[in-house]
């Protein structure tokens, strides 16, 4: 009886370890520019203003069969902000908005990943402008597989919202400009 119990426990431990082994680590493909982190916000309620961050780095762990093992970590250099207008970008880097002299980086670290149907709900801590708050991103696996260079890739699209007042933005552009939409598209190369 003791032998059967020990064998059962050993087999169970091996199965648990095997499912954890399916989780793969990916580096976001920044060198190949197969990644985008941006935002949009209403400008005075009349139009959408789009911006992007050109300098960021990160990684993720992905296991389609065990979403609880999935993790995301991203660091953004806020001064790399680009809205296609140099004067506006300078103003957005100021104390009224991102305050890049005092807070040069933003960081997102996931705390939980859940699969809901074909999509993923990624909850994490966003540190921006000296404040850390939970943020929810809705993500979708765009695809995964071997690439022509001998690697293996996985790509995701994600979106979410943040309230500007939650992150100490000082300027107020009216009631329709209180939230920003986050727009993310990343492709990761599996680490060997």
From Swiss-Prot:
It holds the Pfam family YceI. The keyword Signal applies. Residues 1-23 form the signal peptide. One of its GO terms (cellular component) is periplasmic space. The keyword Signal applies. It is found in: Periplasm. Keywords: Periplasm, Signal. Coiled coil: none annotated. InterPro entries: Lipid/polyisoprenoid-bd_YceI, TTHA0802/YceI-like_sf, UPF0312/YceI. It comes from the Bacteria. Belongs to the UPF0312 family. Type 1 subfamily. HAMAP family: UPF0312 (MF_00780). This is UPF0312 protein plu2095. It comes from Photorhabdus laumondii subsp. laumondii (strain DSM 15139 / CIP 105565 / TT01) (Photorhabdus luminescens subsp. laumondii).
